[in-house]
């Protein structure tokens, strides 16, 4: 197989190159998602670069009005359809200086640890800021203006109760979100305790991301398993 061209600006082009090389099957649904990701790449490139700020700098910036936020993407569908592969292609190409890619539950564990650390500072008299969400959001913004999550799902009430307030801060100050999920946003935290308190986050999410489904007929995970020798 010939070495592939180094496509670093278009998910569509990289997908087509991999297909032409025989590494992937042609998949119209994947190309559709790739086109959405290319739109985000273009918007990120066109946006005026944000000045690097410390967490304290972000706290002061909160008072200066909303930042320009590039609309992100929420890709949902069954497992094995290629959602994570496409997001990873996008992440590597994203023209931003600070970005983070992780599993959603890893991110939320980090958030809860930061909230706990802030409450300890409050208890020890090291801060007078009673609400931990603004400083935690400021820390996250100082570290990454682009967040890419794998497997966005909400099953824990502690996560559910914090998401709307946290992402109100993140989105308002320029954070872009690209995420994969197995469920449509309206079914996040379905039948969860006090779900009514979680629903404002769903509305917020749909305001700042385009929601698309990856309904490829092929389960590439199963295809790989079936090709293995028994």
What are these regions (language model features)?
Residues 25-60:
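N-terminal pre-Walker A segment at the start of P-loop NTPase domains
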Residues 53-75, 145:
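Pre-Walker A (Motif I) flank of P-loop NTPase domains
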Residues 80:
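Walker A (P-loop) phosphate-binding loop of P-loop NTPases
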Residues 83:
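Conserved lysine of the Walker
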Residues 92-127:
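AAA+/P-loop NTPase substrate/partner-engagement loops
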Residues 115-146:
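Conserved alpha-helical scaffold flanking the Walker A/P-loop in AAA+ ATPase domains
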């Amino acid at each position: 197989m010939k070495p592939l061209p180094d496509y670093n600006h278009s998910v569509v082009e990289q997908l087509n190159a991999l297909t032409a090389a025989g590494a992937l099957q042609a998949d119209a649904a994947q190309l559709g998602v790739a086109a959405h990701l290319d739109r985000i790449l273009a918007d990120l490139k066109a946006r005026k670069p944000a000045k690097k700020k410390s967490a304290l700098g972000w706290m002061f910036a909160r008072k200066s009005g909303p930042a320009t936020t590039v609309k992100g993407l929420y890709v949902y569908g069954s497992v094995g359809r290629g959602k994570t592969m496409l997001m990873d292609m996008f992440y590597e190409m994203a023209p931003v200086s600070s970005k983070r890619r992780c599993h959603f539950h890893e991110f939320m564990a980090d958030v809860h640890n930061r909230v706990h650390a802030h409450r300890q500072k409050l208890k020890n008299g090291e801060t007078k800021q009673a609400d931990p969400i603004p400083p935690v959001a400021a820390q996250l913004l100082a570290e990454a203006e682009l967040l890419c999550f794998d497997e966005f799902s909400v099953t824990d009430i502690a996560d559910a109760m914090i998401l709307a307030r946290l992402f109100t801060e993140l989105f308002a100050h320029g954070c872009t979100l690209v995420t994969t999920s197995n469920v449509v946003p309206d079914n996040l935290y379905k039948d969860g305790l006090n779900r009514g308190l979680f629903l404002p986050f769903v509305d917020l999410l749909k305001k700042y991301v385009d929601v698309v489904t990856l309904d490829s007929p092929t389960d590439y995970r199963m295809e790989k398993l079936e090709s293995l020798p028994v």
